[in-house]
Amino acid sequence: MMPAMRASLILGCLLIIGPWAILAENPLPTIFPDKDELVQALHSSFTLKCTGESEVSWQNPNSNPEKQNVVIRSEENNSGLFVSILEVSDASAFDTGLYTCYHNHTQTEESEIEGTDIYIYVPDPNVPFAPPGLFDHIIVVEEDESALVPCRTTDPSSEVTLKNIESSRTVFAFYDSKQGFAGNFPPGSYICETTSNKMVYQTEPYILQTWKATHNISVEMEAPKTMFRAGETIAIDCIVLDNEVVDLKWTYPGKQRGVGIRNVEESKVPYQRLVYTLTLANATTEDSGEYECAVIHATLDNRVVKKTNITVHEKGFIDLEPMFGSEEFANLHEVKSFIVNLHAYPTPGLFWLKDNRTLSENLTEITTSIVTTKETRFQSKLKLIRAKEEDSGLYTLVAQNDRETKSYSFILQIKVPALILELVDKHHGASGEQTVGCLAKGMPVPDVEWLVCKDIKRCNNDTLWSILATNGSEISMETHQDDEQIESQVTFKKIEETMAIRCIAKNELGVVARELKLVAPTLRSELTVAAAVLVLLVIVIISLIVLVIIWKQKPRYEIRWRVIESISPDGHEYIYVDPMQLPYDSRWEFPRDGLVLGRILGSGAFGKVVEGAAYGLSRSQPVMKVAVKMLKPTARSSEKQALMSELKIMTHLGAHLNIVNLLGACTKSGPIYIITEYCFYGDLVNYLHKNRDNFQSRHPEKPKKDLDIFGLNPADESTRSYVILSFENNGDYMDMKQADTMQYVPMLEMKEPSKYSDIQRSLYDRPASYKKKPLSEVKNILSDDGFEGLTVLDLLSFTYQVARGMEFLASKNCVHRDLAARNVLLAHGKIVKICDFGLARDIMHDSNYVSKGSTFLPVKWMAPESIFDNLYTTLSDVWSFGILLWEIFSLGGTPYPGMIVDSTFYNKIKSGYRMAKPDHATHEVYDIMVKCWNSEPEKRPSFRHLSDIVESLLPMEYKRCYETVLHDFLKSDHPAVTRMRSDSDNSYIGVTYKNEHKMKDRESGFDEQRLSADSGYIIPLPDIDPVSEDESGKRNRHSSQTSEESAIETGSSSSTFIKRDDETIEDIDMMDDIGIDSSDLVEDSFL
């Protein structure tokens, strides 16, 4: 046959046989009777027979669990077919439905049944509708799609009506008794209705819902891990977004073995999300392979498949893949990286070693990093930022997990140019032999060679250098080398003339050379002597410089008091009087032989204060107990000038009840002595500490722990010393050292109270109520007779007297600059006296003073403008007065308790921090402190205003008592008063200001008016008006002199009583023993 004809014949056969061959391969079973539907009578029986080429099964509609009337059995057929018989007895409405026979091998778990169908009706007049399925009453369809209401009837001839419950209207639609009503129905509730035996029957409501279906399917597969070890759990998520009308099928290696748990979770926030999870616990290597999830749209022919590969290892592993060799090189200062790739599971821990020691993570020029490139792929990088010579060494990367540890090591060599470490001349003494050593290093190790130049003056010409020739007798050479260095030595048996020798070291990175001059032995000794002299000279110069620096940094004594001469127009610059330009009146001079010194009351870095007895200082008091200020014998000239300045300022100021008054001075034929009043009770801080246990306050139950503000332990009170000005050195107050008992000269004490304070002590022991008190409560306030306790009235009295004393200093344009309780003394009668005790205080070791350059400053007492701008005025003294007021009402507490003077302290002062009210202060007293601590100096009250405020808190009787004591003082023959009175008859008493608004002018500006009471030195003062005699009687404050009518004529000190040469202080003490009243001979202070 022709080939073309044969091909056509074969193709035709295929076309004819092909479809039958396909049908023959998958034929459907056969049901007998061979009909589409049958109607069976109620309670009858029927049989269905199914025949197939393989095993067959039935799907029947019987949904009544209580009636087991269906029997299925198999029969054998001689033709080799498989036969299944379905027998139904006592048929009922529950048996109405579709019966399907199918081959078993054609069905899967998730596929629809494909077989041969027959529909059976069993009419029941009482049950016109076939029983519905479990979920048939909920109908969900896509928008604009046809819906099926499955109200099937048991009788095919029944007429059925569909009604909408909400509208109660009949819905016209196509009806099939095997399926129900089909059509496009709006959402709502529907019922089916039919009539049987003249009765109307209705179904349960059918709920119809529609949704807008998404045609697109968005699927994501998430597998946190794709690599596992045997025994771990595999978890894979298949996520469907924005579509819930889908079906999902898993395909994976373990599905045939029935392993795996499949779950689904749905969330609608923030968007529609279906998460299908496949979980396989205790994975094995058989679970390795491809995992697939197929998502199929429920109503559309859409399908999306996602796949991933899972690998399960029997155990963990680590594989290292270095990108470099076992020995590497890097140039000096080169940036170089070394990378190692890793394939490992589980994730390993990685670290680098250098010379078997862990590389520190804080290195700045060697960094390590780890990057994960894939799930089981990693990359570790060692990077040299600027390679250094010391970076050479053995580097090791160690990788380890819970099952395995692996490492990779390599040697790194840093190439370094040749470098000569030292070139030395080793002289061998008298033999004349000299050895020159050259030590060099580099990587690679350099080679060394020697050159010599014998014409020493022309060695800068390289052509005169020649290679050093060695011979065994005169010149020899030795070389020693290790892995890093090389040392070459040249030995000369004898050098007869000076020459230069050059060492050259070279390797592949560079060449370096150093030269050395070799000197003949005869010249060496001369050079040695010259060098020794030069070194000695340098040492001497350095020592002198150090001594000068130490001398300049040593603190110098300076008087704190300053007298203002003028002020700049803007008020920010003050010009102070140079005390050395003030005159010194010789009338203050007192003969040295009239002064007997006793024990030391206090000593400091610059001087001391000594108790003394002055003979002939006063006409009415032949012997007076005094305090004598003097410098130490080692004092410098600048400190002598400072003490002389203090003397001149005191003579300029004049006398006042509330300052420590000058009594005399010894300035000739010996050291300078300043003689001042002696105050029996010492400084105010000491007095407050001593009497704080006897303080009568509104809070007598206050516990002892409140003493912590003083930095003291109450249990130690019995051991604390309170003798005049002698204190224990606790660092809080003056470093007053106890005097040597061998130096002590006994002083006479008064036998009766002073005639200027002969007023009994008040019984007033309660806080001032600031109302007028009866005379019986305030009588004899200024006396210290009898009871040793303290009251709030005493504290107000101290405050008032300090304010009066500072008012007097302010009227003299005097700025104190160190106003504090330690610089306030207490005399008999509780008379307060302001002083400057800096000379006798060890301020270098006093915590109240802070070093600033060559001086020490009491920072905690200073105003902000003094601390930060070095500006001292009367208004800055007002700030210090507020601090002193806090000290008084805290009974001697240290200001800013618990705070040290540092940057934090300064910042707090700048930001407006102020101390809280002390325990014993009333709100009125604390208000005074706050006014004194105003950050703007011009808004602080003046001392005159402060005196008025405190005076208003005191009883009127106290004011009268104080004015009486002041008046008696100014009329007395006190040496300070008489010397000033003899200078001028113009009284200080009664000087006042024209207007109240000029109070600020007293601190901030002065005119050209001058007082004649200033010892002849002219100081500018504000405008003042003299007052009348009546006004003078009402306010007698400021006088440092009395009027001519009350003046007591006195002579100079040279005409007063002089101590006999053979008389001692001990002789005076004996006067009491023989009945002589010494009270007229000794005046304790001026009282």
From Swiss-Prot:
Catalytic residues, chain numbering = 818
What are the record keywords, sorted? ATP-binding, Cell membrane, Cell projection, Chemotaxis, Developmental protein, Disulfide bond, Glycoprotein, Golgi apparatus, Immunoglobulin domain, Kinase, Membrane, Nucleotide-binding, Phosphoprotein, Receptor, Repeat, Signal, Transferase, Transmembrane, Transmembrane helix, Tyrosine-protein kinase, Ubl conjugation
Please list where the region (Disordered) is annotated: 1017-1064
The signal peptide here is: 1-24
* Cytoplasmic-facing ranges: 552-1087
Task: State what inhibits or activates this protein.
Answer: Present in an inactive conformation in the absence of bound ligand. Binding of pdgfa and/or pdgfb leads to dimerization and activation by autophosphorylation on tyrosine residues.
PTM comment text: Ubiquitinated, leading to its internalization and degradation. Autophosphorylated on tyrosine residues upon ligand binding. Autophosphorylation occurs in trans, i.e. one subunit of the dimeric receptor phosphorylates tyrosine residues on the other subunit.
Where does the protein principally reside?
Answer: membrane
Which residues are modified to Phosphotyrosine? 574, 576, 722, 733, 744, 756, 764, 849, 988, 1017
Transmembrane intervals? 531-551
Instruction: Enumerate the GO terms in the molecular function aspect.
Output: ATP binding; platelet-derived growth factor alpha-receptor activity; platelet-derived growth factor binding
Q: Which GO terms describe its biological process?
A: cell migration; cell surface receptor protein tyrosine kinase signaling pathway; chemotaxis; embryonic cranial skeleton morphogenesis; positive regulation of cell population proliferation
* Reactions listed under catalytic activity: L-tyrosyl-[protein] + ATP = O-phospho-L-tyrosyl-[protein] + ADP + H(+)
What EC number(s) would the UniProt record show? Answer: 2.7.10.1
Subcellular compartments? Cell membrane; Cell projection, Cilium; Golgi apparatus
CDD domains linked to this entry: Ig4_PDGFR, IgI_PDGFR-alphabeta, PTKc_PDGFR_alpha
Q: Which residues lie on this side of the membrane: Extracellular?
A: 25-530
Q: Which SUPFAM superfamilies match?
A: Immunoglobulin (SSF48726), Protein kinase-like (PK-like) (SSF56112)
Q: Which portions of this protein are annotated as coiled-coil regions?
A: none
| One Gene Ontology cellular component annotation held by this UniProt entry | Golgi apparatus
An example Pfam family from this entry, by short name, is I-set
Recorded topology in the membrane: Single-pass type I membrane protein
Q: What does this protein do?
A: Tyrosine-protein kinase that acts as a cell-surface receptor for pdgfa, pdgfb and pdgfc and plays an essential role in the regulation of embryonic development, cell proliferation, survival and chemotaxis. Depending on the context, promotes or inhibits cell proliferation and cell migration. Plays an important role in the differentiation of bone marrow-derived mesenchymal stem cells. Required for normal skeleton development. Required for normal development of the gastrointestinal tract. Plays a role in cell migration and chemotaxis in wound healing.
Please give the family membership noted in the entry: Belongs to the protein kinase superfamily. Tyr protein kinase family. CSF-1/PDGF receptor subfamily.
* The protein, known as: Platelet-derived growth factor receptor alpha
Annotated organism of origin: Xenopus laevis (African clawed frog)
